[in-house]
Amino acid sequence: MSAATDEILEKLKSLTLLEAAELVKQIEETFGVSAAAPVGGMMVAAPVAGAAAAPAEEVEEKTAFDVILEEVPADKKIAVLKVVRSLTGLGLKEAKEVVESTPKPVKEGASKEDAEAAKKELEEAGAKVSIK
């Protein structure tokens, strides 16, 4: 590795969890990307021979789902906050912002199973959740 990348890596190692979350947010905003890990592997472009069949396959079934936190009753905020933190790995401040600024995506690009599991956990904690 080059000296520049070594230096960046060392600085990243010294970040607190809160600073790392802020860094991720800034990178997402600056470069217009999402840090959500793709569940189910990378999407690969269809071969040229199968290009005509590709659009029909995409219509058949959606593979990436977003879990949207729609509403949180005031008396359930703490329970929902704990679930949001466990699902996302966010710090307390970031998770609180998500819970208090509904509707807000909690998980993006999740598999159907993961999205359903997250929805179930959030609903058990008292939140109103949708999957898109």
From Swiss-Prot:
GO biological process, one term: translation
Presence of the UniProt keyword Glycosyltransferase in the record: no
InterPro entries: Ribosomal_bL12 (IPR000206), Ribosomal_bL12_C (IPR013823), Ribosomal_bL12_C/ClpS-like (IPR014719), Ribosomal_bL12_oligo (IPR008932), Ribosomal_bL12_oligo_N_sf (IPR036235)
GO cellular component: cytosolic large ribosomal subunit
Highest taxon of source: Bacteria
Extent of Basic and acidic residues compositional bias: 100-126
Keywords: Ribonucleoprotein, Ribosomal protein
Disulfide bonds: none
Transmembrane helix in keyword set: no
GO molecular function: mRNA binding; structural constituent of ribosome
UniProt xrefs under Pfam families: Ribosomal_L12, Ribosomal_L12_N
Region (Disordered): 100-132
Protein purpose: Forms part of the ribosomal stalk which helps the ribosome interact with GTP-bound translation factors. Is thus essential for accurate translation.
Family listed: Belongs to the bacterial ribosomal protein bL12 family.
Subunit structure: Homodimer. Part of the ribosomal stalk of the 50S ribosomal subunit. Forms a multimeric L10(L12)X complex, where L10 forms an elongated spine to which 2 to 4 L12 dimers bind in a sequential fashion. Binds GTP-bound translation factors.
The protein's name: Large ribosomal subunit protein bL12
